[in-house]
Design a protein with these regions (language model features):
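Sequence-level preference for short, compositionally simple segments enriched
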Residues: 1-312
Length: 312
């Protein structure tokens, strides 16, 4: 095990230095409490990061999409991340990942965690940001604007992996969980930030691939925040085959009675898949949901277990 400590009591004082030192895997990096102001990238399989505790072990940075680059261009969404992992069999426990750039209206997108690979696990982690907090790669098949995908996986194969988020706290405003991966969220809190708009937040914006069985599945999660009543949306489709299923989730009064938004893509009514089962809270108003939102039977909900979605 490698130990990171800001006070010099470990093997390294920087998380990235510890990662770079790894010559054989599997390897575990223990990170003592501290504020680690750095960007961290992981490209090696079979690495585990363990923080001392989620409130005290913080990896933070403040890059953002509107940030000017030396060549006169903007940094863009996919080069704004604080933490980047493109690997398989990765685990993170008890860590806060933060992008502190601020509200999207001022800085644009600002990713805290950019996660791509298969068998990625985040447990008891905090992911703090505003617009586009958590990106669950891969990217969509095609960009809509030239240069829109500039970043570390722009030319990587588009292979959706399996990701697990358990007992995590994820905050943001616009589309703060987005991407094409197969993700299972268990006992997580999604916290929407008020930006004083008619619609303050879209919790999720999946870009699930056509023909992919699963997209985002949330089990026993809470959708909360500090927004006025009926001013948040559970999801909207970044791409038209988006899939989101909520199982026994608690939906606060902040959630709009319609719950889901089509992003002005009426064709998505026939192609996306939004569904709920046995949810609770003032934001769960099934009779007001759009016709394209499904209310599952117990048998149908049985297709969305952790084992079936994540694989174990």
């Amino acid at each position: 095990m490698i130990t990171v400590a800001k006070d010099g009591s470990g093997d390294y004082t920087s998380v990235q230095e510890a990662i770079d030192s790894i010559t054989s895997v599997p390897e575990t990096v223990f990170i003592k409490n501290g504020i680690y102001k750095e960007r961290v990238e992981i490209h090696k399989d079979n690495i585990t990061l363990i923080g001392e505790n989620a409130d005290g072990t913080v990896i933070t940075n403040n890059y953002y999409a509107f940030m000017p680059m030396e060549d006169g261009s903007k940094r863009g969404t996919f080069r704004s991340y604080t933490f980047f992992v493109q690997a398989n069999h990765f685990n993170a426990y008890n860590i806060t990942f933060e992008n502190s750039a601020g509200f999207g209206k001022k800085v644009g997108q600002a990713i805290a965690v950019y996660a791509e690979g298969d068998d990625l696990v985040f447990k008891n982690c905090h992911m703090l940001g505003h617009q586009d907090t958590l990106f669950t790669g891969p990217l969509p098949m095609k960009e809509k604007q030239p240069g829109g995908f500039v970043g570390p996986t722009e030319f990587a194969p588009r292979i959706p992996g399996h990701q697990l988020y358990e007992d995590c706290f994820i905050s943001g405003e616009v589309d703060f969980i987005f991407g094409s991966a197969i993700c299972y969220f268990k006992n997580c809190e999604l916290y929407a930030l008020n930006r004083n708009e008619t619609i303050n937040s879209y919790y999720t914006a999946p870009s699930t691939y056509e023909g992919q069985k699963y997209g985002y599945v949330f089990e026993s999660c809470s959708f909360s925040g500090n927004c006025p009543p009926r001013t948040t949306m559970l999801s909207r489709p970044w791409r038209i085959y988006a899939k989101v299923v909520l199982i026994r989730c608690d939906l606060s009064e902040q959630v709009s009675e319609t719950g889901f938004h089509d992003w002005n893509k009426p064709e998505s009514h026939e192609t996306c898949y939004y569904a709920e089962y046995a949810c609770t809270g003032k934001g769960y108003v099934p009779e007001r949901r759009p016709d394209y939102v499904h209310q599952l039977t117990e048998r149908e909900a049985g297709e969305y277990t952790r084992e079936k979605v994540f694989g174990r």
